């Protein structure tokens, strides 16, 4: 393993510096979106960082109050737009909890399989983007090759590459298409070797290791105090994963490991995501092998569209059902609920208040990127300006999810 050189701040009067303010972003290729950081610098050392957010605010939570529950799914696509199936799933589970229903088992397997594909897709991007931010572009070209395969699979299932809107309350929009299983098995067979390619590119790269190891360290205590979740939490040694500790859907039927590391630095956060992709492949394989027969949508005319779409053209009852759900939606009992999943970025939760109408009275999104961004306050003190790029990239925020 290549030796990592530790950088330290010069002491005494070796350098004559003065404090300056520097704007990093909102238009900067390494801020991962429209994030503006106002940095207080003493020479090259960051004394303070002040994030300015809101450049991508679209009012998702307020818009939801004017939409029926089914119409909200496209809004959730645009939170973490790298992983729409996870956003769809989190929202669907919250509404189903209010209704007191569960999706059919086949639909749950399909949902989990798509959520893990989304996890791999999201982790792939930061696996290549973090090295690219630090000057090693080759890794990004490698990961985009495999990410294109995932986009093809999502397009095969949903008809869309990014904004899938595939989940529905009580199931999924439609069943898996013919020819899907051979395609996803092929991907599962190829992908583990491709992960090893990424590791060979970067594990002995002296520049990458110097720029990530020992940089941006977050202790386990600080990670918990800041409310971090997902790989950013587990990279600090906190063994917590909602899929295992508060299982939803069929995760309690699946065998997988929760990846943790103790270092809490930029490299540990990058490494956690790489190793999690292997676990996701194992989960997808189990979903394929265990996939049961049965309906992909709950059979409740007051909530779900007709399972047989052809009936809409020849049955007055089915036509009325389809029209009512499309035009007016379905009513949800009065109450409030919070439901969370383990999204690629961390704990993604939806808090919904229902007043008994077909539209939520209030919806609050617990976006993991928003919470994880707080870590910038605690990890950049007296570090080089160049380290800011590594720290921000390793936290892997998506600004659409931060600003909502």
Curated annotation (Swiss-Prot):
UniProt keyword NAD present: yes
Its EC number(s): 7.1.1.-
Entries under InterPro entries matching the protein: NADH_Q_OxRdtase_suD (IPR001135), NDH1_su_D/H (IPR022885), NiFe-Hase_large (IPR029014)
GO cellular component, one term: plasma membrane
Keywords: Cell inner membrane, Cell membrane, Membrane, NAD, Quinone, Translocase, Transport, Ubiquinone
Main location per the UniProt record: membrane
Enzyme class: translocase
Pfam assignment, any one: Complex1_49kDa
Cellular compartment(s): Cell inner membrane
Catalytic activity: a quinone + NADH + 5 H(+)(in) = a quinol + NAD(+) + 4 H(+)(out)
MF terms (GO), sorted A to Z: NAD binding; NADH:ubiquinone reductase (non-electrogenic) activity; quinone binding
Membrane topology listed for this record: Peripheral membrane protein
Quaternary structure and partners: NDH-1 is composed of 14 different subunits. Subunits NuoB, C, D, E, F, and G constitute the peripheral sector of the complex.
HAMAP family reported in the protein's UniProt record: NDH1_NuoD
Role of this protein: NDH-1 shuttles electrons from NADH, via FMN and iron-sulfur (Fe-S) centers, to quinones in the respiratory chain. The immediate electron acceptor for the enzyme in this species is believed to be ubiquinone. Couples the redox reaction to proton translocation (for every two electrons transferred, four hydrogen ions are translocated across the cytoplasmic membrane), and thus conserves the redox energy in a proton gradient.
Record-stated family: Belongs to the complex I 49 kDa subunit family.
Protein name: NADH-quinone oxidoreductase subunit D 2
Organism: Rhizobium etli (strain CIAT 652)
Organism taxonomic ancestry: Bacteria, Pseudomonadati, Pseudomonadota, Alphaproteobacteria, Hyphomicrobiales
Gene label: nuoD2
